[in-house]
């Protein structure tokens, strides 16, 4: 009897210990070893001489960035998923930001404050997420990843990033409601380093690797996914130089037999040329070709987003040309971004096969197009 009680007690003790261990390692519990409190000391950061200062500021150890476009890079960190929290007092007249999943200045994810909007919680572009791809910050190609936020200069602001696979939530001063919800991180990397830039102070940096607070790692829903009106497939030429001031005419149309490559649109119907061709050091252009098979003659309306300049030819005749260059006064709404709101034009289609040739030029940040017809009924997009 005593032996039976002993065995039962032993098994019960093992079971309780096992349950306790499972509880300690559950996803909702953060092991102490997983929380990285990053010291604001020079030995933990890589930076250019005299560009960063480490000090006590408002009673907390802080890092002060003294020079714009001179990131302070955290040493010995390979971050993929998890939570990043920090306090920031922005002083930059332009932007204060954090890079993550950073493998170089040319490839990383970037979240930033437009500090000119500090104190204006209704500014539509107060904060933005944008990746840097092939050396190009895609702020002008992804306007749906910006939004309002309540933050201020001359005081601490608390920022929390929750990053899980393809998704990210950004909290600013209010930890109950995200200021930005990013359904798909658009950068090329799944892991990398972390850095800060922009004049101002950084303090209380805490990183919790793999603590994602239940955020799904899967890509979120594309609001245009079920909309058949977008022209999501085209053929693409290679880029060629286009001297400043030169406009495209019918004499510039590509010749029969020129090499073409198939290109599929990204989320929201964006034909993103930056991801393929990278930065334009000087003005250059690419041709996009779309073939439409039409049952009967009809006129359609095209909602058209573009960056920077476009020339649209229908069946070898110039139909539409426009510019969306960020500098005023020729930038398009919304504020020079590539958006379906940029422009629209009539598209007179003949019965049979119609060929659209779209010249796209670029010499400033991102480039690409978005095209959506008012209806695709009676129209077939040919491969």
Predicted regions and their residues:
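Short, aromatic/His-centered strand-loop micro-motif at the edge of beta-sheets
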Residues: 135-158
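Carbohydrate-binding surfaces in secreted/extracellular proteins
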Residues: 152-181, 309-319
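Secretory/extracellular carbohydrate-interaction modules
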Residues: 69-134
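Extracellular/secretory pathway-exposed regions associated with glycan biology
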Residues: 208-295, 364-383
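Short, solvent-exposed beta-strand-to-loop segments that form ligand-recognition rims
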Residues: 173-191, 319-331
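Short carbohydrate-recognition loop motifs
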Residues: 53-70, 82
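Aromatic-lined ligand-binding clefts that engage carbohydrates, nucleic acids, or primary amines
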Residues: 299-313, 356
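Ligand-recognition surfaces built from glycine- and aromatic
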Residues: 186-224, 338-348, 355, 369-372, ...
